[in-house]
Amino acid sequence: MQVTVETKEGLERVLTITVPAANIEDAVNAELRNIAKNRRFDGFRKGKVPMKMVAKMYGSAVRHDKMGEVMQRHFIEAIVKDKINPAGAPTFAPVEFAEGQDLVFTATFEIYPEVTLQGLDKVVVEKPQVEVKDEDVAEMLETLRKQQATWSDADVAAEDGTRATINFVGSIDGELFEGGKADNFPLEMGQGRMIPGFEDGIKGKKAGDELTINVNFPEDYHAENLKGKAAEFAITVVKVEARELPEMNDEFVTKFGAQGGVEGLKTEVRKNMERELAQTVKNKIKEQAINGLVEQNNIDVPSALIDQEVQVLRQQAVQRFGGNADSAPELPRELFEEQAKRRVVVGLLLGEVIKTEELKADDEKVKALINEMASAYEDPTEVVAYYEGNEQMMNNMRNVALEEQAIDAILAKAQVSEKAVGFNELMNQQPA
């Protein structure tokens, strides 16, 4: 077997492989003998049919099949011998082939990029320094009260904290538009659900009031046909309701399944907030470390890996919205391509960190991660036992641990500082 390697643009490689004719003929003849031995032919006893007849009937099809097998086998032998690492399946194309002659074919594919990590000492990470304070717990308890609130008609004007039920009809240049009309629409004032200026027009109004307001749709509004448009809304206030908050007592506590009365609920709420806070802090640090890693290391990405990741994201999108899995390929590629490329880049770079640092999943870290995750459930012991009895779940958790160890390795070389921040400020930050 003769092999030549041609480097194309980027990560593309082309192998030209020559396979001796004898290899092809041996494979074809072996299969024809197998057919002659095991198939029945009219007028012949089993295994007694002449080989020329078998070759005439099946030679072409067998030769075609065996060519594919031979190309696949010799491609694998070639990349193993030359230590080539393909990033996806090759595309085979025969260059020269005639019966009794050597087979010359090409295999076109992409390789994994050679990654040399750099700039880890230039990665900047700001660790949030935050704790759950008594006032944070009190605010969360107040949120729970609001979630359990009841509403009742009141002879009051609409203002923040009340709920106005309205009818409205919207128009642009005198024409009604889709989604611009509603009856008995409940609007909790002060929540910012409507476009800017809409709630302001209703404030101070009472049940039975009619009004007309003029507002502008934001330039970044989700509906393309409404972006930046000036609109007029005719509004009727049907009723205004006041919110009645429940008392913070044992009856209220039982709705949340907490033990130990009001103090028990406070303890449980604080515990949940601290667990959520710890995860958020970890995610913020990880996000900065990965962003810095990507910024400092510009690498080529095999399109084959992006294609694979696009398919994964398509399937996840279909599952998330309850669609038919068969419809996944119909989702436009451009919806996922940028995210897919990012995930491939991050995977390759973290993989190189793991390789360079010679990291292996730490058993104690795996155990700690499982216990941390299980603590959010009613029976943590049962959850831990489930993980420990499921090898696939354990492997998933080992991968999580390995990724965290890679992040720790980045942080060990990065420029890390600390910044004090409030609980709500941190929890309400949008991902970068």
Swiss-Prot record:
PPIase FKBP-type domain segment(s): 161-246
Source superkingdom: Bacteria
GO molecular function: peptidyl-prolyl cis-trans isomerase activity; protein folding chaperone; ribosome binding
Entry's Gene Ontology cellular component terms: cytoplasm
Key words, A-Z: Cell cycle, Cell division, Chaperone, Cytoplasm, Isomerase, Rotamase
Biological process, per Gene Ontology: 'de novo' cotranslational protein folding; cell division; chaperone-mediated protein folding; protein transport; protein unfolding
Catalytic activity field: [protein]-peptidylproline (omega=180) = [protein]-peptidylproline (omega=0)
Family assignment from sequence similarity: Belongs to the FKBP-type PPIase family. Tig subfamily.
Main function: Involved in protein export. Acts as a chaperone by maintaining the newly synthesized protein in an open conformation. Functions as a peptidyl-prolyl cis-trans isomerase.
Domain comment (free text): Consists of 3 domains; the N-terminus binds the ribosome, the middle domain has PPIase activity, while the C-terminus has intrinsic chaperone activity on its own.
Name this protein carries in UniProt: Trigger factor
Organism: Aliivibrio salmonicida (strain LFI1238) (Vibrio salmonicida (strain LFI1238))
